[in-house]
């Protein structure tokens, strides 16, 4: 696990984009993408770039259960607004949060991941150490699954909604086992509120109580953090 410290989120996005360009030069064709505030500066760099992404496939980590793609709180909407509208891809995959059978939807998504192995996976990290929507206690062997969101996650995400009552209580998330199959993982974290999770992820122990700690076992992880998020690493 390599740690890169940056001044701020803008610099972090630039470095993540440089890593992406290197990966593309080596033949990467499938990107695993994340939502939330952490990757926004990275997507801004992609949008500003003259690079053409129309031969690439993207697979997103997760989607809320119960939100239509037209809801401005859905992750499908987030990705279109922050990246896909400006930079079309060959194909974009996100879980269908309105699927009538969400367990079957999770299995369908696993098949998509199997058919499109992820070359470059972008991650954020939750205050409780979750990656994707894999909450503490999630099995490291889990693939795509339906998640009951913890109160801490609902509270953290409530800033994107009118009220905390509007935050969906479930999501469909790529599993930890699926994430670990990615060839390369770039995790971005900014702000003091991420410091505890970053410390636990880097120094262990490796435990399902802190899902991101499993990344210690991956062969190619780069963690991009500002000084606040890295404040407990010294």
Curated annotation (Swiss-Prot):
It is an enzyme of class 3 (hydrolase). InterPro entries: Glc/Gal-6P_isomerase, Glucosamine6P_isomerase, Glucosamine6P_isomerase_CS, NagB/RpiA_transferase-like. Its EC number is 3.5.99.6. Gene3D superfamilies: 3.40.50.1360. GO terms for biological process: carbohydrate metabolic process; glucosamine catabolic process; N-acetylglucosamine catabolic process; N-acetylneuraminate catabolic process. The active site is at 62 (proton acceptor), 128 (for ring-opening step), 130 (proton acceptor), 135 (for ring-opening step). Pathway: Amino-sugar metabolism; N-acetylneuraminate degradation; D-fructose 6-phosphate from N-acetylneuraminate: step 5/5. It holds the Pfam family Glucosamine_iso. CDD domains: GlcN6P_deaminase. One of its GO terms (molecular function) is identical protein binding. GO terms for cellular component: cytoplasm. It catalyses: alpha-D-glucosamine 6-phosphate + H2O = beta-D-fructose 6-phosphate + NH4(+). Keywords: Carbohydrate metabolism, Hydrolase. The keyword Transferase does not apply. Catalyzes the reversible isomerization-deamination of glucosamine 6-phosphate (GlcN6P) to form fructose 6-phosphate (Fru6P) and ammonium ion. Belongs to the glucosamine/galactosamine-6-phosphate isomerase family. NagB subfamily. This is Glucosamine-6-phosphate deaminase. It comes from Streptococcus pyogenes serotype M3 (strain ATCC BAA-595 / MGAS315). The gene is nagB.
